[in-house]
Every structure is written in structure tokens, then in C-alpha cells.
From Swiss-Prot:
<dbReference type="InterPro" id="IPR013126">
    <property type="entry name" value="Hsp_70_fam"/>
</dbReference>
<feature type="region of interest" description="Disordered">
    <location>
        <begin position="577"/>
        <end position="607"/>
    </location>
</feature>
<dbReference type="GO" id="GO:0140662">
    <property type="term" value="F:ATP-dependent protein folding chaperone"/>
</dbReference>
<dbReference type="InterPro" id="IPR012725">
    <property type="entry name" value="Chaperone_DnaK"/>
</dbReference>
<keyword id="KW-0597">Phosphoprotein</keyword>
<dbReference type="Pfam" id="PF00012">
    <property type="entry name" value="HSP70"/>
</dbReference>
<protein>
    <recommendedName>
        <fullName>Chaperone protein DnaK</fullName>
    </recommendedName>
</protein>
<dbReference type="InterPro" id="IPR029048">
    <property type="entry name" value="HSP70_C_sf"/>
</dbReference>
<dbReference type="InterPro" id="IPR029047">
    <property type="entry name" value="HSP70_peptide-bd_sf"/>
</dbReference>
<keyword id="KW-0547">Nucleotide-binding</keyword>
<keyword id="KW-0346">Stress response</keyword>
<keyword id="KW-0067">ATP-binding</keyword>
<dbReference type="GO" id="GO:0005524">
    <property type="term" value="F:ATP binding"/>
</dbReference>
<comment type="similarity">
    <text>Belongs to the heat shock protein 70 family.</text>
</comment>
<feature type="compositionally biased region" description="Acidic residues">
    <location>
        <begin position="589"/>
        <end position="598"/>
    </location>
</feature>
<comment type="function">
    <text>Acts as a chaperone.</text>
</comment>
<feature type="compositionally biased region" description="Low complexity">
    <location>
        <begin position="577"/>
        <end position="588"/>
    </location>
</feature>
């Protein structure tokens, strides 16, 4: 089998690796660097990728950076009169990495394992797979970045069981995953993250500070000057990196602008203390998902054996200090944060080709999946942090008599009401044979494959007719939405609970009205007319209460009607028991027992 390369398709930088002699090896690009900037530039019809594109970004407005932040959305880049989707731009980066691997291996490469942030949703994963396809790669597997990092870290440590926290702060995304390693099994226990937080944001606080300082001194706003801003971005990124090793750095940008008196220069000394003050809220934002992942895994700080740092931004001293303070543990510095993800992807490639044996990877889905049911409730079929691949089925029914079709509204998120979650897709199961409500059996099955991509099937168990949907990128979750869902779910837990209770109460009351009608019809002349009238009156009172918003009244009327219906049922049961004693002799001669409505049979008819 041909080699399966491992690709870390990053927001700021990308990396490619391959398995050689059972060990992952990072492949250097033609410039001799082991990572390639995720930058694409267009100039006079020519496309440039990587270092060469980044170098001319200052003078070329047709330069695209951080495209990963737009994956899974309908965002478009308009360049030289042509529109490009994020998938197409990402494909150009992938093609560059593919060419690097082919040059090193001396053979054509067609297969790859590509990594994505653990908190990437279905649309973003689909978009990544599409980018691979555009680049001429068969994407054998999409795996989560923290999981890939753990794979690279733990490949030679499978002899002992340990729990590992992977803290992955990249250029544009942030993930925390907790894994259990042992006997070659890499099992993800929980994952959390923020898809709008990364090294770019740390650069931005320095840029904002420099713009402000220059404005104070010269009265000019550099944020309106595109070329000046590109120079500031480069300087900010360099200063951020410098401050990981020194306590102070000089930012010097001559001829950044011009005033009435001539050229203006930017000269600022930035201390590490000032940078930490500017980026304090960003560092604090990384702690929320860290605590959430620990809570979801049900672990305390003492349970964590190792903390692995992934992504260049984890080199920031304040980030390392915050992790140490939060978890009470010194992070492991034995892995290269820029390369470890690609190395893990290469190992997964080796697992696929059979070159790596006795390694099993068990990943999880980051958000709950379900469908909308009666009353606008979100009924979860697959909980978040469920190990994938997985499949889950549940049987539902119709809400009205002779209902010919059901709408399946597929949802992703943590809220209790459908309207508060993200719509992944909708489809319809039609041609349901006429039947009373509650009789048809509709089986809904959710299937998540090893790449975290969702398929939903609805099947009428009566007719065996089924309808399927594969969730497509068009219904994508934006980067902000996925993080907002979990936060909203926590903030609105109490309100959600009350709304859910109200819907449940109304559904129960509605069901009781339906059951009462059926019971009165079934009883016919078997009980007193007065008792039937009493049940009818209580039913009408409940229906009237349901038209209003007084939940206490609905509950009281429901309880009253429930008591009456139970009383009627008891009387009917007693009558049936007496009749059964009379028919016992005849019934005992029949060996076949059939569950059915009881019908009194006269002895004469049986002779």
C-alpha cells in the first residue's frame, strides 16, 4: 500500500510528516523549514503558497491568511475578479504540502490523514475533507489535533496506563482534550474548546497597542493604512515570539507613515510584563474550556499524569504559568508543539496501512446530536463526548391522526429546546399509511463515522420505507456559535428546565385527553352514564386549561382527570376479571395464548 502522509492543516502554519521505519518523520519544505506558513498569495495570475507568499504580504493586497477560520462557512475571497471558497484556498496549501512529501519520498502521494481542531463541527470537518479532495488527496481519516498529539507523545509509552491532558493553542483555534492511554488504546475522555481563540488574537493585542501608542505620539491612525498594518502584524508576531525568551523587546519600524514634517517612524519598547497585561483576558479564556474538559471527564488535578502543550502559542510564558497554576503540574516540554500534530497524523496513517500495529484510537464527538420532537423539544440521541464511530437509534411516532409525513429536524448543541440549538439539516419521511396518532413507528438512527461526519436515517418500521441525509457543509455552525452553545446551555440551564417542564406537562395533558376519549369509547355501556359524563366534563376542563398559561391549573386539572380515568379503568378491570372467571373453563382448553381485547364468549357459541 502506498504511503499515507499526515498533515496538520493549521491556521498560521502547516506541517507534513510520514512514517518511516515505524517512526514519524517531519518533512522539511524546499526552503528547509519544517513548517510552512498557511498563506496564499495571487499575483498576475500566479499562485504563491507558504514562505514566499508570506514575505510579499506587505506589498500584495491579494494575500490570504488564516483561511482556516472560515472553513465550513459560505465565506468567499474575491481575488482578481474571481471568487474562492475557503476549501479552495486550503486545497492550495494542501497541494504545496503534498508536493513537498512527493519530492522527499520520490513517489506520487494520493492518500492523507488530515487533522482538525477537536471542536470543529460537522460542516468544518466536511469542508476539510473537500479541501483534500480538491488537492487531489484521498482523505483516509480526519482526526482531532489533540488526539494526534497524544498519539505522537504516547506511541512509545503504551506499557503503562496514564491520563494525559492536551492543551492545544494554535494560531486561530484552541482545544483541550483529556485522553486515557494504555495497552495501545488511546481513548478520548472529554474535549472542549474555543474556535475563536489563538495566536492571531495575541498578535492583535500588540497591534492595537502599537496603533494606540503611535496615535498618541503622532496623531495618526495607522489602522487605516493597509501596508502599515501588514508591517505591524509582522512586527507584533516577532515581538510575541521574542518575549517568550527575553523580558523586553524593541519594535522598530522606520518610515511607517508620513506627516506634514516628513517621514514618521515607530519606535516602541515592549516588555513581557506589558504584553502579559495586554493579553491577560486571552490567557484567562483558555482556562474555561480546561475546567470544562476536566469536569466532563470527571477528573481532579491529581488524576492527570501529564500535560502536553501543542501549538506555537503555548510557548508564551503567561500561558504556561496559567496551566501550571490551574492544574498544579509542570507541562511536559518533551514534544515539539509545532510538529507533534503532524507526527500523530502520520502515525494514524501508519495504523491505516498496517505499518503500526496494536494501536487503537477512540475519539469523541464534541457536541450533542438529536432531533426536534413535539413541543419544540430537542431530544438528544447522541450525547457530547460520546466515543466515535457510533450509531444510536430511537423509535418515535406521529403527533396527529392519519399523519402522512414526519419532518426530521436534525440538531447539534446542548440546549433543551430545538430553537436554541443549531440546525444541521431537515428532511421528510413521507407516505406513512393512515393510522391513529402514536401508532406508526418511525425509527430515527444517527450514525457518526470515524471522521466525526453525521448521517441520519428515518425509517417507517411498518412499510420499511426509509429516508437518509448526510449533513452537508451548507448548514454550518460558525466558529462563535459552537462555543456559545455550551456557554448558553450553562447560563440558561434553569430557564431551559422550566420550559422543558412546561412542554412535558402540556404533552402529558394532551396525551391524557386523547386517552380519555379512547377510554370512553371503549367503555361504551360498561360503566354508568353519570361516570362517563364526569370524565367528559373533567376532560373539557383540562382542554380549556390547556388554552391558557396557568401551569398550576393545567397540572391540577390533569391530576383530577387522571384520577377519574384510573377509577373507570379499575371498574372495567374488575368487570373483566369477573367475566374471565366465568370463561376460565373454556379458555384453559386452548393452548394458544393471544394478547387481545377481551370479548365475552357465550357458552352456546362454543359448542
Amino acid at each position: 500500500m502506498s504511503k499515507v502522509i499526515g498533515i496538520d492543516l493549521g491556521t498560521t502554519n502547516s506541517c507534513v510528516a510520514v512514517l518511516e521505519g515505524g517512526e514519524p518523520k517531519v518533512i522539511a519544505n524546499p526552503e528547509g523549514n519544517r513548517t510552512t506558513p498557511s498563506v496564499v498569495a495571487f499575483k498576475n495570475g500566479e499562485t504563491q503558497v507558504g514562505e514566499v507568499a508570506k514575505r510579499q504580504a506587505i506589498t500584495n493586497p491579494n494575500t490570504i491568511i488564516s483561511i482556516k477560520r472560515h472553513m465550513g462557512t459560505d465565506y468567499k475571497e474575491n481575488i482578481e475578479g474571481k471568487e474562492y471558497s475557503p476549501q479552495e484556498i486550503s486545497a492550495m496549501i494542501l497541494q504545496n504540502l503534498k508536493a513537498t512529501a512527493e519530492s522527499y519520498l520520490g513517489e506520487k502521494v494520493t492518500k492523507a490523514v488530515i487533522t482538525v481542531p477537536a471542536y470543529f463541527n460537522d460542516a468544518e470537518r466536511q469542508a476539510t475533507k473537500d479541501a483534500g479532495k480538491i488537492a487531489g488527496l484521498e482523505v483516509e481519516r480526519i482526526i482531532n489535533e489533540p488526539t494526534a498529539a497524544a498519539l505522537a507523545y504516547g506511541l512509545d509509552k503504551t506499557d503503562k496506563e496514564q491520563k494525559v491532558l492536551v492543551f492545544d493553542l494554535g494560531g486561530g483555534t484552541f482545544d483541550v482534550s483529556i485522553l486515557e492511554l494504555g495497552d495501545g488504546v488511546f481513548e478520548v475522555l472529554s474535549t472542549s474548546g474555543d474556535n475563536k481563540l489563538g495566536g492571531d488574537d495575541f498578535d492583535q493585542v500588540i497591534i492595537d497597542y502599537l496603533v494606540e501608542e503611535f496615535k498618541k505620539e503622532n496623531g495618526l491612525d495607522l489602522s487605516q493604512d493597509k501596508m502599515a498594518m501588514q508591517r505591524l502584524k509582522d512586527a507584533a508576531e516577532k515581538a510575541k515570539k521574542d518575549l517568550s525568551g527575553v523580558s523586553s523587546t524593541q519594535i522598530s519600524l522606520p518610515f511607517i507613515s508620513a506627516g506634514e514634517a516628513g517621514p514618521l517612524h515607530l519606535e516602541v519598547t515592549l516588555s513581557r510584563a506589558k504584553f502579559e497585561e495586554l493579553s491577560h483576558t486571552l490567557v484567562e479564556r483558555t482556562m474555561g474550556p480546561t475546567r470544562q474538559a476536566m469536569k466532563d471527564a470527571g477528573l481532579s488535578n491529581a488524576d492527570i499524569d501529564e500535560v502536553i502543550l501543542v501549538g506555537g502559542s503555548t510557548r508564551i510564558p503567561a500561558v504556561q504559568e496559567a496551566i501550571k497554576k490551574e492544574l498544579g503540574k509542570e507541562p511536559n516540554k518533551g514534544v515539539n508543539p509545532d510538529e507533534v500534530v503532524a507526527m500523530g497524523a502520520a502515525i494514524q496513517g501508519g495504523v491505516i496501512t498496517g505499518d503500526v500495529k496494536d494501536v487503537v484510537l477512540l475519539d469523541v464527538t464534541p457536541l450533542s446530536l438529536g432531533i426536534e420532537t413535539m413541543g419544540g423539544v430537542s431530544t438528544v440521541l447522541i450525547e457530547r463526548n460520546t466515543t466515535i464511530p457510533t450509531s444510536k437509534s430511537q423509535v418515535f411516532s406521529t403527533a396527529a391522526d392519519n399523519q402522512p409525513a414526519v419532518d426530521i429536524h436534525v440538531l447539534q448543541g446542548e440546549r433543551q429546546m430545538a430553537a436554541d440549538n443549531k440546525t444541521l439539516g431537515r428532511f421528510q419521511l413521507t407516505d406513512i399509511p393512515p393510522a391513529p396518532r402514536g401508532v406508526p413507528q418511525i425509527e430515527v438512527t444517527f450514525d457518526i463515522d470515524k471522521n466525526g461526519i453525521v448521517n441520519v436515517t428515518a425509517k417507517d418500521l411498518g412499510t420499511q420505507k426509509e429516508q437518509k441525509i448526510t449533513i452537508q457543509s451548507s448548514s454550518s455552525l460558525s466558529d462563535e456559535e459552537i462555543d456559545r452553545m455550551v456557554k448558553d446551555a450553562e447560563a440558561n440551564a434553569e430557564a431551559d428546565k422550566k420550559r422543558r417542564e412546561e412542554v412535558d406537562l402540556r404533552n402529558e395533558a394532551d396525551q391524557l385527553v386523547f386517552a380519555t376519549d379512547k377510554a370512553i369509547k371503549d367503555l361504551e355501556d360498561k360503566v354508568d352514564a353519570a361516570e362517563k359524563e364526569k370524565a367528559e366534563a373533567a376532560k373539557e376542563e383540562l382542554k380549556k386549561a390547556l388554552e391558557g398559561n396557568d401551569l398550576e391549573e393545567i397540572k391540577a386539572k390533569k391530576d383530577t382527570l387522571n384520577e377519574i380515568v384510573q377509577g373507570l379503568s379499575m371498574k372495567l378491570y374488575e368487570q373483566m376479571a369477573q367475566a374471565q372467571q366465568g370463561a376460565e373453563g373454556a379458555a384453559s382448553q386452548d393452548d394458544d395464548v393471544v394478547d387481545a381485547d377481551f370479548t365475552e364468549v357465550k357458552d352456546d357459541d362454543n359448542k
